[in-house]
């Protein structure tokens, strides 16, 4: 099913801790056409550089061989492998379709989530390994930072609450969607650090910034902290007030 194809792709990205994974055009031809079309149009599959090696089909030995490409004067391109195992085989042509690759990584997944939920994707840098900020998500009661966790499997994280990304994915009108209602519930139900713990985090960040950039103003320090997940949506003036306490 289309959902199964997306879950398979997300599982591979999670297994590589968010790093880029590639899928060949040959493999994609075995996936549901609707899934492949949606994955490409929604930015979850992006063009990758052509494969540098292939399994040679010149004989039954199925050797993995490097691909050589020649561009002729008229602009036409020919790719092939050179067999060094058999005396009766030399160049084995490789169709361009066999070399085509598509890629997906955690950043592409974050972009898909932001677009699906109508979020402005944040420029906040990760403050924790394996936890990527996506954007400020609104519930019915509060607004909090939505993040993507990439440890082993992909999960949406709000505050201390987490949910596997695969559990909130569906397909509608030929495109992949996220369950907005469930996400709103996550935002409203998320428990964040208590007030004193939050203030302590700001004070620690303030001291670290002062040590790194000693000649900046307190306003500048508070503005930098406001761009990080530990701000929890608070503005710079609120942070400044409590980081100096």
Model regions: which residues?
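Low-complexity, PEST-like segments
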Residues: 1-204
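K/R-rich mixed-charge low-complexity regions
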Residues: 170-245
């Amino acid at each position: 099913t289309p959902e199964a194809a997306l879950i398979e792709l997300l599982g591979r990205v999670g297994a590589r801790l968010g790093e880029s994974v590639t899928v060949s055009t040959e493999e994609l031809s075995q996936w549901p056409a609707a899934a492949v079309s949606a994955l490409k149009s929604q930015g979850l599959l992006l063009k990758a550089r052509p494969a540098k090696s292939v399994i040679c089909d010149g004989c039954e030995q199925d050797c993995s061989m490097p691909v050589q490409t020649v561009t002729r004067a008229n602009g036409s391109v020919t790719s092939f492998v050179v067999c060094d195992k058999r005396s009766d085989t030399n160049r084995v042509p490789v169709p361009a379709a066999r070399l085509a690759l598509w890629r997906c990584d955690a950043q592409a997944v974050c972009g898909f989530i932001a677009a699906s939920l109508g979020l402005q994707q944040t420029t906040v840098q990760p403050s924790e390994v394996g936890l990527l900020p996506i954007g400020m998500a609104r519930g019915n009661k509060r607004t909090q930072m939505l993040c993507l966790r990439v440890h082993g499997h992909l999960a949406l994280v709000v505050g201390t609450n987490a949910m596997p990304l695969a559990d909130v994915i569906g397909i509608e009108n030929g495109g992949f969607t996220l369950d907005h209602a469930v996400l709103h519930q996550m935002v409203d139900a998320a428990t964040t650090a208590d007030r004193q713990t939050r203030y302590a985090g700001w004070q620690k960040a303030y001291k670290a910034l002062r040590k790194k950039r000693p000649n900046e103003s307190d306003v500048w320090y508070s503005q930098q902290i406001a761009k990080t997940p530990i701000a929890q949506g608070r503005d710079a003036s609120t942070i400044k007030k409590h980081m100096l306490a």
